[in-house]
């Protein structure tokens, strides 16, 4: 397949996407796609899993987000538009992380990317204009913080087209036509999509912008459609049937992968694009996949600086012995359980050492002890590590 899915959501798009990263990667591999772009809502949490499993099955990973885009820090504008942001190279991935971090600092309710943040960290980044809830889409037909959605049958006003042109020019000034694309989606059953795609085709020619096809994937298989309604209803105070009624458009569309290039090209033609426009939009996904060449930065294993030339394993064992000596002074009765104590401690130390976690335990102990010395409250901890003898 020439088509590469760039607009994809997994379970890391919380309460919206369905299917694990691994399920999505396996699905596109079976369909014959050579790459996959994942764009979770406002986070990069799936990227490590994407790289790991994509490499296993021979698929190229593309790292992005579907950002909440718009004014920040304003409670009155909580309905943010959407924007696809992707890393092209190492610098771009660092900038993508900076953008995401700043979005959580600036935002109210949703992690929102401001135009200023996007412009400041634009190097190595490419942008897709977004879905029918994007800034460009909502400028044309309303929605989100730009007012009520307008029916496509009402037409698009000259004023809306002029505003859209100014916003397109802003993106072009920042990214140029090499890094900014108009996103056309594959849903001929949705009137809004048809109206937008037709207008995007006109704007693309006027401003010299390439069209890019997406499937707005939210689940790996078409049969998973019903699960999205369940997920949405669980998130909001509605029943499944109420939610399907209130947002029926989302469940009428197949938010899954096309099974061939012909399928998505036919869908795009069904929205009003010419066949040549549809074919070019599909081919552009492959061009973008070639442009995105990111390998995630790898952290070096934590190594704790030990004393007296000891290894971390030796240091941890010494600390365990010191801890035992401290506790039998506090509670002499424990001395009768010395054999039991050291048998259990030995088992735990072997497991910790085998997993190369000695440095982690030493660093954690150093952090906790330092906090105590500065009269900073430290909780008792939870879980198997906190409850262990070590």
Model region roles, listed by residue range:
Residues 1-35, 41-187, 193-207, 225-231, ...:
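Extended substrate/RNA-proximal surfaces in nucleic-acid metabolism proteins
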Residues 92, 130, 212-221, 376-390:
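Conserved phosphate/anionic-ligand binding catalytic regions in large, soluble enzymes, centered on
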Residues 38-44, 184-192, 219, 303-309, ...:
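Conserved short loop/turn motifs at secondary-structure junctions
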Residues 1-2, 136-137, 144-147, 269-384:
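Non-catalytic structural connector segments
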Residues 41, 67, 215-217, 302, ...:
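Residue-level "edge-of-site" marker
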Residues 60-74, 79-82, 209-212, 217-224, ...:
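Phosphate/diphosphate-binding loops
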Residues 4, 37, 86, 213, ...:
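Short conserved micro-motifs on helix faces and helix-strand junctions that flank
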Residues 19, 39, 385, 389:
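Gly/Ser/Thr-rich beta-alpha loop segments that engage phosphate groups in nucleotides
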């Amino acid at each position: 397949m020439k088509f590469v899915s760039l607009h994809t959501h997994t379970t890391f798009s919380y309460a919206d996407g369905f299917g694990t990263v691994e399920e999505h990667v396996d699905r596109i591999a079976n369909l014959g796609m050579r790459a996959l772009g994942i764009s979770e809502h406002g986070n990069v949490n799936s990227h490590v899993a994407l790289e790991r499993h994509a490499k296993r099955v021979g698929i190229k990973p593309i790292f992005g987000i579907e950002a909440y885009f718009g004014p920040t820090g304003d409670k009155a504008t909580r309905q943010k538009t959407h924007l696809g942001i992707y890393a092209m190279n190492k610098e771009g991935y660092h900038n993508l992380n900076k953008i995401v971090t700043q979005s959580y600092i600036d935002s109210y309710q949703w992690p929102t990317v401001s135009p200023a943040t996007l412009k400041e960290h634009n190097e190595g980044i490419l942008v897709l204009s977004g879905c029918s809830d994007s800034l460009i889409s909502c400028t044309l037909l309303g929605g989100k913080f730009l007012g009520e959605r307008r029916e496509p049958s009402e037409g698009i006003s000259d004023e809306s087209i002029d505003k859209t042109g100014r916003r397109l020019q802003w993106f072009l000034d920042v990214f140029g036509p090499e890094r900014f694309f108009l996103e056309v989606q594959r849903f001929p059953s949705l009137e809004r999509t048809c109206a937008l795609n037709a207008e995007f085709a006109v704007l693309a020619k006027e401003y010299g912008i390439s069209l890019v096809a997406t499937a707005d994937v939210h689940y790996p298989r078409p049969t998973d459609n019903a699960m999205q309604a369940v997920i949405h209803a669980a998130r909001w105070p509605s029943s499944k049937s109420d939610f399907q009624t209130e947002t029926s458009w989302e469940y009428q569309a197949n938010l899954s992968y096309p099974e061939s290039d012909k399928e998505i090209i036919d869908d795009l033609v069904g929205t009003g694009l010419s066949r040549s426009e549809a074919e070019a939009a599909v081919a552009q996904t492959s061009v973008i996949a070639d442009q995105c060449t990111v390998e995630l930065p790898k952290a070096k294993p934590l190594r704790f600086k030990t004393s007296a030339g000891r290894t971390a394993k030796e240091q941890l064992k010494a600390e365990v012995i010191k801890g035992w000596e401290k506790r039998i002074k506090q509670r002499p009765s424990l001395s009768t359980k010395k054999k039991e104590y050291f048998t259990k401690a030995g088992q735990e130390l072997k497991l910790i050492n085998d997993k190369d976690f000695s440095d982690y335990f030493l660093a954690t102990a150093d952090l906790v002890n330092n906090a105590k010395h500065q009269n900073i409250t430290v909780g008792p901890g939870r879980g198997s590590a906190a409850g262990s003898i070590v």
